[in-house]
UniProtKB/Swiss-Prot annotation:
This is Growth/differentiation factor 6. CDD domains: TGF_beta_GDF5_6_7. Its main location: secreted. GO terms for biological process: activin receptor signaling pathway; apoptotic process; BMP signaling pathway; cell migration involved in metanephros development; epithelial cell migration; fat cell differentiation; metanephros development; positive regulation of chondrocyte differentiation. It comes from Homo sapiens (Human). Disulfide bonds join C354-C420, C383-C452, C387-C454. Growth factor that controls proliferation and cellular differentiation in the retina and bone formation. Plays a key role in regulating apoptosis during retinal development. Establishes dorsal-ventral positional information in the retina and controls the formation of the retinotectal map. Required for normal formation of bones and joints in the limbs, skull, digits and axial skeleton. Plays a key role in establishing boundaries between skeletal elements during development. Regulation of GDF6 expression seems to be a mechanism for evolving species-specific changes in skeletal structures. SUPFAM superfamilies: Cystine-knot cytokines (SSF57501). Glycans are attached at N114. Residues 77-91 have a biased composition (Low complexity). Changing E292D: In LCA17; increased protein expression associated with decrease in growth factor activity. It is linked to Klippel-Feil syndrome 1, autosomal dominant: A skeletal disorder characterized by congenital fusion of cervical vertebrae. It is due to a failure in the normal segmentation of vertebrae during the early weeks of fetal development. The clinical triad consists of short neck, low posterior hairline, and limited neck movement. Deafness is a feature in some cases and may be of sensorineural, conductive, or mixed type. GO terms for cellular component: extracellular space. It comes from the Eukaryota.
Length: 455
C-alpha cells in the first residue's frame, strides 16, 4: 500500500472520530491539571445548555447533600413546603381524648351504629377540641383563681351548638390540704361574670387520685360571640353558694383559701396531653370535603403575601389552575389505585354488568395527609359495569332507567344506556386539623359505596 493512500485513509479516520461525542474533550491536552478540570466542567455545562449554578433539589437529594442557597436568594428552609402548608405552623399533635373519640366511633360505624346515637356525642356530627392558651398568674399566692383562654373563632354561627365541656386534668396533690373547714368546692365561671357554669366538690379528708374533671360550659359558650372564650376556675371552702363577703365575715378562724396548685390544677410542669381542653359538640349541615379544602385555601391566603406563591400548598383560590383536590406540586406523584385501573375499562371487562368494585383511597397520595390525621386510607369502592336489557332486580332500577334501557336496546344510536351509580352510601369518621390548628372529629356522609344500581 503506497504512502498517499495510507495518509488519505488516516485523514478520513480522524475526520470521522472528530465528530464522535466526547472525542474532542478527550483529545484536547492541557499543560496543567487546573486548566484540564476547568475545560471539562465548561464542556459539561455547555452540553447541558445552562450556566454553572447550585444543584437543584432533586440533584442535591441524589448526592445526599442539602443545596446551599445563594446569598441573594431567600434560604430554602424559610420557604413553604408541601408538607408544612403556609399559615399552619408546626405539626399539631392530637389529644388522646380526640383519638379515643375517633377510635370509638370508627368501630361503631363498622358495626353499623351511627355515632349520633352515643350519649357522649350529644347528637352531634362534629366534635372540635381547643387547647388552653392561658398562663398561670404567678403574682397571686395562693392561686385561688385561674383563667383558661380558648380561641373559638373557627366555630361557625351556621352550626348548631349542642354541647360544650371543659376537661381539666387534676394531678395528685403533693401535700395535705390542711384542716378541713367544710366542703371544698371548685367552681367554674365565665370571666368577669357571676354566672356559675358548673362546680365539683372535693373530699378534703382523702387524697383523691389524679384524673380528669369535666365541667359543663354550654351556657357560657352559648351566650357570647364565638371569638374568645375565657373561663375562670375558683376554689372555696364552705357552702356552694357562699360568696367572698360571707367568707370574710366569718372572722380570723376562717382557714386560708385553698391553693389551686396544691389541688392539682396548676399549669406548670404539665405535659401536652394533660393541658386543659375545651371540647365543643356541634351539629352542622351536610358538608363535603371540598368545603374543608376551601377553608384550607382561605387560611393560606390569610397567612401572608407569600402564602400563594408558586410551588406552595395550597394554591390561591383565585388562580385558574387552583384545584386543591389534586396532589401538591412538590410531592412525588404516584399512580393511585384508581388511576392504575382507569385504562382497563375497554374491551371484555367493560361488558361486565353493573356491580360494586374496589377503590382504595390513600389520602397521603392525594396530598391530604397535611391536614387529615386519620384514617390515612380507606376502601371507598365504586360502581362499574353496563346496564343492559334485561335489568336485574337487585340493581333496583328506577322506572326511568327501565324505559331508557328499553329504548337503548331497540336503538342504541339514539338513546344511551342507563348509568351504573351508587344507590347506597355510608359515612366514615375523619379526624383532621382545621384552618385554626384545632383537632376536629367529623362524620362525613356518603363516603363508602354499599350498593350499586342502574339510574
Amino acid at each position: 500500500m503506497d504512502t498517499p493512500r495510507v495518509l488519505l485513509s488516516a485523514v478520513f479516520l480522524i475526520s470521522f472520530l472528530w465528530d464522535l461525542p466526547g472525542f474532542q474533550q478527550a483529545s484536547i491536552s492541557s499543560s496543567s491539571s487546573s486548566a484540564e478540570l476547568g475545560s471539562t466542567k465548561g464542556m459539561r455545562s455547555r452540553k447541558e445548555g445552562k450556566m454553572q449554578r447550585a444543584p437543584r433539589d432533586s440533584d442535591a437529594g441524589r448526592e445526599g447533600q442539602e443545596p446551599q442557597p445563594r446569598p441573594q436568594d431567600e434560604p430554602r428552609a424559610q420557604q413553604p413546603r408541601a408538607q408544612e402548608p403556609p399559615g399552619r405552623g408546626p405539626r399539631v399533635v392530637p389529644h388522646e381524648y380526640m383519638l379515643s373519640i375517633y377510635r370509638t366511633y370508627s368501630i361503631a360505624e363498622k358495626l353499623g351504629i351511627n355515632a349520633s346515637f352515643f350519649q357522649s356525642s350529644k347528637s352531634a356530627n362534629t366534635i372540635t377540641s381547643f387547647v388552653d392558651r392561658g398562663l398561670d398568674d404567678l403574682s397571686h399566692t395562693p392561686l385561688r383563681r385561674q383563667k383558661y383562654l380558648f380561641d373559638v373563632s373557627m366555630l361557625s354561627d351556621k352550626e348548631e351548638l349542642v354541647g360544650a365541656e371543659l376537661r381539666l386534668f387534676r394531678q395528685a396533690p403533693s401535700a395535705p390540704w390542711g384542716p378541713p373547714a367544710g366542703p371544698l368546692h371548685v367552681q367554674l365561671f365565665p370571666c368577669l361574670s357571676p354566672l356559675l357554669l358548673d362546680a365539683r366538690t372535693l373530699d378534703p379528708q382523702g387524697a383523691p387520685p389524679a384524673g380528669w374533671e369535666v365541667f359543663d360550659v354550654w351556657q357560657g359558650l352559648r351566650h357570647q360571640p364565638w371569638k374568645q372564650l375565657c373561663l375562670e376556675l375558683r376554689a372555696a371552702w364552705g357552702e356552694l353558694d357562699a360568696g367572698e363577703a360571707e367568707a370574710r365575715a366569718r372572722g380570723p378562724q376562717q382557714p386560708p383559701p385553698p391553693d389551686l396548685r396544691s389541688l392539682g390544677f396548676g399549669r406548670r410542669v404539665r405535659p401536652p396531653q394533660e393541658r386543659a381542653l375545651l371540647v365543643v359538640f356541634t351539629r352542622s349541615q351536610r358538608k363535603n370535603l371540598f368545603a374543608e379544602m376551601r377553608e384550607q385555601l382561605g387560611s393560606a391566603e390569610a397567612a401572608g403575601p407569600g402564602a400563594g406563591a408558586e410551588g406552595s400548598w395550597p394554591p390561591p383560590s383565585g388562580a385558574p389552575d387552583a384545584r386543591p383536590w389534586l396532589p401538591s406540586p412538590g410531592r412525588r406523584r404516584r399512580r393511585t389505585a384508581f388511576a392504575s385501573r382507569h385504562g382497563k375499562r375497554h374491551g371484555k371487562k367493560s361488558r361486565l354488568r353493573c356491580s360494586k368494585k374496589p377503590l382504595h383511597v390513600n389520602f397521603k397520595e392525594l396530598g391530604w395527609d397535611d391536614w387529615i390525621i386519620a384514617p390515612l386510607e380507606y376502601e371507598a369502592y365504586h360502581c362499574e359495569g353496563v346496564c343492559d336489557f334485561p335489568l336485574r332486580s337487585h340493581l333496583e332500577p328506577t322506572n326511568h332507567a327501565i324505559i331508557q334501557t328499553l329504548m337503548n336496546s331497540m336503538d342504541p344510536g339514539s338513546t344511551p344506556p342507563s348509568c351504573c351509580v351508587p344507590t347506597k352510601l355510608t359515612p366514615i369518621s375523619i379526624l383532621y386539623i382545621d384552618a385554626g390548628n384545632n383537632v376536629v372529629y367529623k362524620q362525613y356522609e356518603d363516603m363508602v359505596v354499599e350498593s350499586c344500581g342502574c339510574r
